[in-house]
Amino acid sequence: MAKKSTPVDSGRSKGKKASAPRGGGPAVIATNRKARHDYHILDTYECGVVLVGTEVKALREGKASLVDAYATIDAGEVWLRGLHIPEYSRGNFWNHTPRRVRKLLLHRREIDSLTGKVRDGNHTLVPLQLYFVDGRLKCELALARGKQDYDKRQDIKRRTEEREVVRELGRKIKGMKG
């Protein structure tokens, strides 16, 4: 009977890579948590992002920031501005510019629909998250309307009340068991 061979460790360092998880789902690179706090999300779109080689490598290292990012529509094309992808750590002289404007890929009918809604006013395009699907970077783009301060306070109050209800139910259920 032949012996089963065991895998040998190559000795390479196992750095943090943003590849797809074992389940085959998307590997999330960056999320814009503040967007859901500052905006009412009306609709979301999945769009592709045009990148250069060193940007892809930097994103695979899990580096990106959506903090000040937003999208604009110019001449029938959607552009992502303010996205920060730091330079690739092992890049050379030809490394990319960290805050360059990147083109987003959407269907024509989606762009036309967004153009009409954004032009009417009070709406903006905000990226919610960046993730890889089948090796391609996707951006979840949201059509959003800005919240006023009183809206934010109402949301905080509502979440606090929901937490209190859950806490009380937990206490009552725990008391019934004892």
UniProtKB/Swiss-Prot annotation:
Key words of the record: Cytoplasm, RNA-binding
Record CDD domains: SmpB
GO CC terms: cytosol
GO biological process: trans-translation
Protein location: Cytoplasm
Keyword tRNA-binding: no
Organism domain of life: Bacteria
Sample GO molecular function, one term: RNA binding
Region (Disordered): 1-28
Role description: Required for rescue of stalled ribosomes mediated by trans-translation. Binds to transfer-messenger RNA (tmRNA), required for stable association of tmRNA with ribosomes. tmRNA and SmpB together mimic tRNA shape, replacing the anticodon stem-loop with SmpB. tmRNA is encoded by the ssrA gene; the 2 termini fold to resemble tRNA(Ala) and it encodes a 'tag peptide', a short internal open reading frame. During trans-translation Ala-aminoacylated tmRNA acts like a tRNA, entering the A-site of stalled ribosomes, displacing the stalled mRNA.
Family: Belongs to the SmpB family.
Protein name, entry field: SsrA-binding protein
Organism in which the protein naturally occurs: Corynebacterium urealyticum (strain ATCC 43042 / DSM 7109)
Gene: smpB
